[in-house]
C-alpha cells in the first residue's frame, strides 16, 4: 500500500535538568575568549603609520628625496642597526598557550677583600655595609647582560701572588743595570798611537796578501796538467790521394825499424826423465814432465835429496791423486823448513843415468 499522507513526527518529552548544557556553554565561551585574545594581539594590530608597508602608488619616474645626498657613514648605519636589533620583537601567542616569561640574567658580583681598620665602630660598619649593598643592587640593575670578571678571594692565591711580586722585586734589585757609553765619552787617540796602529795593520795586511798569493799559485799549478811528450824516433802513417805513405822521424830509418830476419821459435820443454815433449810442470821443483811415472820419479828424487824430510813432509795432493789415494778430507798444509840446498838443473842430469853416486858407493862397499 502506498501512503499518501506522511505521518507526523513524534517528539519524546524529557525531564529538564539543572546542569543541562552547562559544559557545552562553558566550552563555547572559552573558545570565544581565546579567539578574541588571539586576534587582539599586538602583532596582528594594524598600525596607523606602518613604516614597513606602504601602498603602491602609480607614479612614474620619481626619485627619492635623498637621491642627491651623500651616503651615511658606516658608524651611523651600525648604530641604527643596533637600535633596530634592540627593539622588542612582536610574537604570536597561539590559543591555549601562555606567553613565556623572560628569564633574568644572573650577574656575578665582584667580591673583593675588605680591610677593616681597628678604629671604626661596629655601628658605623653596619651603616656602611647597608649603603654598599644598596649601591651594589643599583649597579646590578644598570649592568644587566654585561659580563663581570670573577676574582678569586682565596688566601692561598693572594699569598702566592705576594711571593711572586717579592721574588720579582728581589731579582730586579740584584741585576745590575746595563751601563751604556755616552757618545762624548769615547777615548780619543793621540797621533803617535794612530801611527803605531797603522804600522801594525800594514804588517798584518802584507802577511795576509802573501798567503793569498801563495794559495793562488798552488791552485794554478794544480790546474795545469803537463802531458808527457815523446821525443824519440817515430814512424808516421799518411794517406793522401789514394796513396799511403810512411814517414820516419827523429832518427828512425827503414832498415832499423823493419827487420827481415825471422824470429826464432821458443824452445819446447822436454821431460827430464823420459826426454819426451813435456806437457806439465811440477809446481814444487819447477821441472817439466810428460807422464805420471816421471812425476813420481821427480818427487821421489826430491825427497831422497832432502834427508829426514820424508816423514815430516807430505808428498802433496797432486801426488796422492796420482797414486790413487784421493784427496784427504781435511788436511793442514805442512810447513817446509828452509834449507840452504837448492835443486838445480844439474841434479836433473843424474836422473838420466841408470845408477846414481849413492848406488855406486853401495856397490863398492
UniProtKB/Swiss-Prot annotation:
<feature type="compositionally biased region" description="Acidic residues">
    <location>
        <begin position="355"/>
        <end position="365"/>
    </location>
</feature>
<dbReference type="InterPro" id="IPR013272">
    <property type="entry name" value="Vps72/YL1_C"/>
</dbReference>
<feature type="compositionally biased region" description="Basic and acidic residues">
    <location>
        <begin position="118"/>
        <end position="132"/>
    </location>
</feature>
<feature type="coiled-coil region">
    <location>
        <begin position="184"/>
        <end position="225"/>
    </location>
</feature>
<feature type="region of interest" description="Disordered">
    <location>
        <begin position="43"/>
        <end position="83"/>
    </location>
</feature>
<feature type="coiled-coil region">
    <location>
        <begin position="123"/>
        <end position="150"/>
    </location>
</feature>
<keyword id="KW-0175">Coiled coil</keyword>
<feature type="compositionally biased region" description="Acidic residues">
    <location>
        <begin position="48"/>
        <end position="74"/>
    </location>
</feature>
<keyword id="KW-0287">Flowering</keyword>
<feature type="region of interest" description="Disordered">
    <location>
        <begin position="95"/>
        <end position="147"/>
    </location>
</feature>
<dbReference type="Pfam" id="PF05764">
    <property type="entry name" value="YL1"/>
</dbReference>
<comment type="function">
    <text>Component of the SWR1 complex which mediates the ATP-dependent exchange of histone H2A for the H2A variant H2A.F/Z leading to transcriptional regulation of selected genes (e.g. FLC) by chromatin remodeling.</text>
</comment>
<comment type="similarity">
    <text>Belongs to the VPS72/YL1 family.</text>
</comment>
<keyword id="KW-0221">Differentiation</keyword>
<dbReference type="GO" id="GO:0000812">
    <property type="term" value="C:Swr1 complex"/>
</dbReference>
<feature type="compositionally biased region" description="Low complexity">
    <location>
        <begin position="342"/>
        <end position="354"/>
    </location>
</feature>
<keyword id="KW-0217">Developmental protein</keyword>
<dbReference type="InterPro" id="IPR046757">
    <property type="entry name" value="YL1_N"/>
</dbReference>
<dbReference type="Pfam" id="PF08265">
    <property type="entry name" value="YL1_C"/>
</dbReference>
<feature type="region of interest" description="Disordered">
    <location>
        <begin position="333"/>
        <end position="365"/>
    </location>
</feature>
<comment type="subunit">
    <text>Component of the SWR1 chromatin-remodeling complex composed of at least ARP6/ESD1/SUF3, PIE1, SWC6, SWC2 and H2AZs (HTA8, HTA9, HTA11). Interacts directly with SWC6 and H2AZs, but not with ARP6.</text>
</comment>
<dbReference type="GO" id="GO:0030154">
    <property type="term" value="P:cell differentiation"/>
</dbReference>
<feature type="compositionally biased region" description="Basic residues">
    <location>
        <begin position="99"/>
        <end position="108"/>
    </location>
</feature>
<feature type="compositionally biased region" description="Acidic residues">
    <location>
        <begin position="133"/>
        <end position="144"/>
    </location>
</feature>
<protein>
    <recommendedName>
        <fullName>SWR1 complex subunit 2</fullName>
    </recommendedName>
</protein>
<dbReference type="GO" id="GO:0009908">
    <property type="term" value="P:flower development"/>
</dbReference>
Amino acid at each position: 500500500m502506498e501512503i499518501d499522507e506522511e505521518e507526523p513526527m513524534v517528539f519524546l518529552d524529557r525531564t529538564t535538568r539543572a546542569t543541562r548544557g552547562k559544559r557545552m556553554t562553558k566550552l563555547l565561551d572559552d573558545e570565544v575568549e581565546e579567539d578574541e585574545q588571539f586576534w587582539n594581539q599586538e602583532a596582528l594590530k594594524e598600525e596607523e603609520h606602518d613604516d614597513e608597508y606602504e601602498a603602491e602608488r602609480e607614479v612614474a619616474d620619481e626619485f627619492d628625496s635623498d637621491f642627491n645626498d651623500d651616503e651615511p657613514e658606516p658608524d651611523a648605519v651600525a648604530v641604527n642597526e643596533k637600535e633596530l636589533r634592540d627593539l622588542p620583537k612582536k610574537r604570536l601567542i597561539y590559543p591555549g598557550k601562555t606567553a613565556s616569561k623572560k628569564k633574568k640574567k644572573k650577574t656575578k658580583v665582584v667580591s673583593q677583600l675588605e680591610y677593616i681598620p681597628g678604629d671604626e665602630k661596629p655601628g658605623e660598619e653596619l651603616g656602611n655595609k647597608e649603603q654598599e649593598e644598596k649601591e651594589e643592587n643599583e649597579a646590578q640593575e644598570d649592568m644587566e647582560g654585561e659580563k663581570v670578571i670573577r676574582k678569586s678571594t682565596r688566601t692561598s692565591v693572594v699569598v702566592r701572588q705576594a711571593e711572586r711580586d717579592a721574588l720579582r722585586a728581589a731579582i730586579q734589585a740584584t741585576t745590575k743595570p746595563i751601563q751604556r757609553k755616552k757618545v762624548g765619552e769615547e777615548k780619543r787617540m793621540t797621533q803617535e798611537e794612530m801611527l803605531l796602529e797603522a804600522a801594525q795593520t800594514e804588517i798584518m795586511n802584507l802577511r795576509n796578501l802573501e798567503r793569498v798569493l801563495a794559495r793562488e799559485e798552488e791552485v794554478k799549478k794544480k790546474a795545469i796538467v803537463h802531458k808527457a811528450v815523446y821525443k824519440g824516433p817515430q814512424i808516421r802513417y799518411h794517406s793522401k790521394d789514394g796513396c799511403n805513405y810512411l814517414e820516419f822521424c827523429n832518427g828512425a830509418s827503414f832498415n832499423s825499424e823493419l827487420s827481415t830476419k825471422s824470429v826464432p821459435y821458443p824452445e819446447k820443454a822436454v821431460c827430464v826423465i823420459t826426454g819426451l815433449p813435456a806437457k806439465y810442470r811440477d809446481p814444487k821443483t819447477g821441472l817439466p814432465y810428460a807422464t805420471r811415472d816421471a812425476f813420481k820419479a821427480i818427487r821421489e828424487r826430491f825427497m831422497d835429496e832432502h834427508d829426514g824430510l820424508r816423514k815430516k813432509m807430505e808428498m802433496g795432493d797432486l801426488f796422492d791423486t796420482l797414486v790413487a789415494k784421493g784427496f784427504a778430507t781435511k788436511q793442514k798444509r805442512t810447513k817446509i823448513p828452509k834449507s840452504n840446498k837448492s835443486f838445480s838443473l844439474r841434479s836433473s842430469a843424474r836422473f838420466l843415468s841408470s845408477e846414481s853416486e849413492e848406488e855406486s858407493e853401495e856397490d863398492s862397499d
